[in-house]
Amino acid sequence: PPEVARLLEAAYKNRSPRQGLRDWALLAFLYGTGLRISEALSLTYADLTYQDGVPHAVRVLGKGNKERVVVLSPTAQRALFQWLKHRNLEGHPTSPYLWSHTAGRERGKPFPARTVQAMLKRVARRAGLKDWARLTPHKLRHSYASALMEAGRGIDEVKELLGHASIATTQIYVHVSRKRLEEAARALPEVF
């Protein structure tokens, strides 16, 4: 979606290249996985699976302590790969967390959700997004679900990726575009 692209571009164009990379990578990862913010920030290296030297999937402990495996989209793969490459170049301490501070007295500790929330609002404002003050990391989860549906994925697939117990919950997340609704209506065969 164009709003997500603008958000990611604004995140990357930070006065501090290090901070820009971090903000871009984390927001792209959240959008590219559909994870809840708590799920993403609690991920450790032990939760990560590689394929051909590239991050491939993450093991997530979701609501109700239900475990699921989320295969990374190309967007999430690129974002995580770039972030981990940066952390290794910076000589990051052996923090088990994928998304942790790389400097200062918080070095090695995972980012708090409120820090990510504040960063997202700053970036959204810089991107010129309307309603930037109401944007939350959870909205990226909604965008992920809607984008998958727009791409023709079934609601059962989206339900599993989001870790929902019920399709009714997934339906709340899915915002079908007018174009898709028109295509659906035209798909009905004519009878006369």
What are the residue ranges of the model-derived segments?
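Conserved catalytic core of the tyrosine transesterase superfamily
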Residues: 1-192
